[in-house]
Amino acid sequence: MSSPIPGSVASLLSQARQTWAEAVLEDQPAEKYRGAHIAALRAAASVLALRARPAVTGNRRPTSAWVLLDRLAPELSEWTAYFSDSARRRAAIEAGSVSVVSERDADDLLRAAGEFIAIVERMAGMLSLDAAS
């Protein structure tokens, strides 16, 4: 019998799936790319919510979700590298440089984000069991 997925994790996964679905409908490549990246980021946040352990730290600099995910879920390292790289383009888009991505770039990221979300959704059941032990 599996443990239920914590509400915060289920909520993040639901938000990831919803954001991804909205990105699918975008006409502009930059907005499609941005939405796909945010959807993947929300899926990553759900893994962090399951695996992260609060730590007392001093003056640590902020760490990207992708760096944290790479540390806490090394089995996702290829994904973290891919989405960490796409974060730079998303930041450029949010700064107004909408021409930094093509339609193909946006479609590729959208496909990757959908695949990543599905992987994380499958992992969530296994991770909730791990967290309970």
Q: Would you name each region that the model predicts?
A:
Residues 1-133:
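Terminal alpha-helical segments
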